[in-house]
């Protein structure tokens, strides 16, 4: 699978400096939801994306190249409280420039925490994507923390109902256990037309 050939390409704080891509998959989510860990597990790697227990570690747009001009993009987490209002505004601008203003073919994967559940910020992000007609999916990470309380089917159904999306748009994974990634890997491989 081509995803295991993914390499770090560049980091930038300005989306306008990104070269044009053929297609890209963009990961967004609340701070400390495990975006970097999801990317590592998705690509069969341990340290491709830097992880940290400190929320707000990712403060730049991190781009990973799979094959020529087909990218995974990790955006800064939203909702981290310990930054200034000005820095939050810069992050918001960075996210808008990357997702809306760039004209590359794209799909956004919104990562939510199964244990915490979707937050107001997650709903705001999904509403914003819908308003801008940006295709998106939901990844429910940290499922290992709740499977002794609820079933995967219950998580899937509740997520679909809350976000008003189709069943194929929900992916339940555990980056920590590296489980549940097969369906997500196939979805991304198909979207990016990887071989």
Indicate residue ranges for each PLM-predicted region:
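Conserved G1/Walker A P-loop phosphate-binding module
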Residues: 1-82
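Structured catalytic cores of enzymes that bind and process phosphorylated ligands/cofactors
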Residues: 32-33, 39, 62, 107, ...
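Conserved nucleotide-binding/hydrolysis micro-motifs of P-loop NTPases
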Residues: 13-14, 57, 70, 77-80, ...
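Conserved C-terminal guanine-recognition region of P-loop GTPase G domains, centered on the G4
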Residues: 96-168
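Generic structural signal for conserved hydrophobic packing positions in ordered secondary structure
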Residues: 8, 31, 64, 91, ...
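Helical mechanochemical/support elements of P-loop NTPase systems and associated helical scaffolds
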Residues: 47, 60, 71, 87, ...
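Canonical P-loop GTPase G-domain recognition
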Residues: 2-16, 145-195
């Amino acid at each position: 699978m081509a995803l295991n050939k993914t390499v770090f390409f560049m980091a930038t704080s300005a989306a306008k400096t990104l070269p044009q891509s053929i297609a890209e998959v963009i990961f967004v989510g609340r701070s400390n939801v495990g975006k970097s860990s999801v990317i590592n597990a998705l690509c069969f790697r341990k340290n491709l994306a830097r992880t940290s227990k400190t929320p707000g570690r990712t403060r730049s747009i991190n781009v990973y190249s799979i094959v020529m001009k087909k990218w995974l993009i990790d955006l800064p987490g939203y909702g981290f409280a310990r930054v200034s209002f000005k820095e939050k505004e810069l992050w918001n601008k960075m996210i808008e420039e990357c997702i809306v203003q760039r004209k590359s073919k794209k799909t956004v994967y919104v990562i939510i925490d199964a244990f915490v559940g979707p937050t107001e910020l997650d709903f705001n992000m999904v509403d914003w994507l819908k308003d801008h007609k940006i295709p998106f999916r939901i990844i429910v990470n940290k499922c290992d923390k709740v499977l002794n309380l609820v079933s995967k089917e219950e998580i899937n159904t509740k997520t679909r109902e809350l976000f008003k999306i189709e069943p194929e748009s929900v992916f339940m994974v555990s980056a920590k256990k590296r489980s549940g990634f097969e369906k997500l890997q196939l979805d991304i491989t198909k979207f990016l037309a990887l071989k």
